[in-house]
């Protein structure tokens, strides 16, 4: 075969591939061809769920870094495995009898993997959240992060318990504690208190030069926090770091350093290194507040969980917290792009699968479900639950969304997604567009600093979800933008607005 013939065959194959992908409309092409995107790579597909056909596409079979659109798969697998009505049950047991109000043994909190254990619940049956992932430096979640633990302490007190001869122990054996989430580096654990961070809120003084003050949430004696922070002039960029005392082996002495401008408080955070130990301490605090005299577990030895489990019977249960349905937890994950919660789900699903087969993990559960649905996973790569290690093709994502839409829980999944220009991570995207309020989709972002050019590079921006056209056509879509490097302010915002604009244009023109 001659080189010219090989070239001709390659050109013909490429032409056939392009012909098989209906090109996007001119208005969308104009967005893609903007000068700032000249080095970037686009991929997308808009797919009619009822006609089961592609409306238009670009690079639909190529793999793209998807960012947090990965959470669509993670959450969908959990919907399919746990069910939308699944409730987490976190229980407190005693290991011995009660004599004169004193437990002759330990009090053991059995972690259930509830991602929202300490999140305040609205009376309407939803969890409180802000439109930004709390773990990424967003403001503290509304309400007292220890309110659920206080309710459990009140239940124990109502049983007449006034103390324990043993210790307060957290059984975190549901799955392995200690792996750090890829995006935030927060520790994954079956016990999640305040998203496994302590909020460090820095309040400036009234005038420049005055010291700033620090408060923490949850309020606990677990930490000693020193402040070396100064108030700067209004408009000065905030610079706050939370440092651990290197001489403190327990990581319980912190110092806040830096500056904050006159005005509103600045939020920082400290990632809890061992959530189960932190949980033992704060649970002991709230039990003592309820009049139950206890101490947290002492020493570094891992408890004998098998021995403790013999006490996990109804007659020894002293308190229980039942979560809202999983569909409410999914709203927090998808609306705010909650990394820790999403990263925990494969561990949780793996722990349930391991009951049936010891060699199962969460990704085995996902693969079996996806392939059982007839989806070709050649267009998908997933190494974590949140999106720090994944690749997807636009065509895989739209077929996945097609499958999800047909499930009994598909409406709950759809309603948990951010809404364009309205809420969640899409609250500020295309707020004045005709499609605002009409597109439900998950965002995704992965960026890093480019020290060579002193700028941010957006490795990935994604948007995938659904809308219904004005004529009633149900559309699933996936849009990806990779390798966006341009000297523009806030490039992730520029990319996010562009993807939102593409979705909005599609809503306008698809009849």
Residue positions per predicted region:
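Conserved serine DD-peptidase/penicillin-binding transpeptidase domain
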Residues: 21-34, 80-377, 471, 494-497, ...
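Cleavable N-terminal signal peptides
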Residues: 7-8, 18
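N-terminal signal peptide c-region/cleavage motif recognized by signal peptidases
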Residues: 14-15
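Small-residue-rich helix-loop
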Residues: 55-57, 147, 343-511
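Short active-site loop at a secondary-structure junction
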Residues: 57-77
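Bacterial N-terminal signal peptides that target proteins for export
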Residues: 1-6
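A short, well-structured edge-of-sheet supersecondary motif
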Residues: 33-58, 299
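Residue-level preference for non-acidic, small/hydrophobic
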Residues: 28, 52, 71-78, 168, ...
């Amino acid at each position: 075969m001659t080189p010219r013939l090989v070239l001709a065959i390659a050109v013909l194959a490429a032409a056939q591939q392009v012909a098989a992908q209906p090109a996007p409309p001119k208005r969308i092409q104009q967005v893609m061809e903007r000068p700032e995107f000249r080095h970037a790579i686009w991929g997308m597909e808009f797919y009619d769920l009822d006609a089961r056909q592609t409306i238009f596409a670009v690079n639909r079979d190529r793999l793209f870094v998807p960012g947090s659109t990965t959470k669509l798969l993670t959450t969908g697998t959990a919907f399919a495995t746990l069910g939308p009505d699944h409730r987490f049950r976190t229980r407190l047991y005693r290991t011995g009898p009660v004599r004169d109000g004193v437990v002759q043994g330990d009090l053991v909190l059995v972690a259930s993997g509830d991602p929202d254990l300490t999140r305040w619940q609205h009376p309407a049956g939803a969890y409180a959240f802000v439109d930004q992932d709390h773990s990424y430096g967003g403001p503290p979640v509304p309400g007292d992060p220890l309110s659920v633990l206080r309710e459990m302490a009140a239940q124990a007190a109502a049983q007449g318990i006034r103390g324990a001869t043993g210790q307060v122990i957290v059984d975190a054996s549901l799955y392995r504690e200690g792996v750090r989430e890829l995006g935030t580096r927060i520790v994954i654990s079956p016990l999640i208190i305040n998203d496994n961070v302590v909020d460090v809120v820095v309040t400036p003084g009234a005038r420049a030069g005055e010291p700033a003050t620090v408060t923490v949430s949850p309020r606990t004696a677990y930490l000693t926090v020193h402040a070396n922070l100064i108030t700067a002039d209004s408009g000065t960029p905030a610079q706050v770091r939370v440092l651990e005392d290197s001489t403190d082996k327990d990581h319980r002495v912190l110092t806040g350093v830096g500056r904050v401008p006159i005005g509103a408080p600045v939020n920082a955070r400290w990632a809890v290194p061992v959530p189960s130990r932190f949980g033992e301490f704060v649970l002991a605090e709230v039990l003592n507040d309820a009049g139950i005299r206890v101490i947290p577990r002492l020493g570094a030895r891992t408890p004998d969980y098998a021995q403790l489990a013999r006490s996990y019977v109804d007659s020894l249960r002293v308190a229980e917290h039942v979560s809202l349905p999983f569909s409410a937890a999914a709203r927090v994950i998808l609306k705010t792009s909650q990394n820790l919660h999403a990263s925990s789900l494969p561990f949780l699903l793996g722990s349930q699968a391991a009951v049936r087969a010891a060699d199962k993990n969460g990704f085995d559960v996902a693969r079996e479900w996806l392939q059982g649905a007839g989806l070709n996973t050649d267009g998908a790569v997933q190494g974590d639950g949140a999106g720090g290690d994944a690749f997807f093709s636009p065509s895989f994502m739209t077929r996945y969304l097609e499958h999800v839409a047909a499930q009994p829980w598909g409406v709950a999944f759809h309603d948990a997604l951010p809404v364009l220009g309205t809420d969640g991570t899409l609250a500020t995207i295309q707020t004045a567009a005709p499609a605002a309020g009409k597109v439900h989709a998950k965002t995704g972002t992965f960026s890093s600093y480019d020290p060579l050019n002193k700028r941010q590079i957006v490795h990935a921006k994604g948007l995938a979800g659904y809308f219904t056209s004005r004529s009633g056509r149900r559309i699933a879509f996936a849009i990806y933008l990779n390798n966006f490097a341009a000297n523009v302010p806030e490039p992730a915002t520029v990319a996010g607005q562009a993807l939102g604009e593409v979705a909005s244009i599609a809503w306008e023109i698809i009849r």
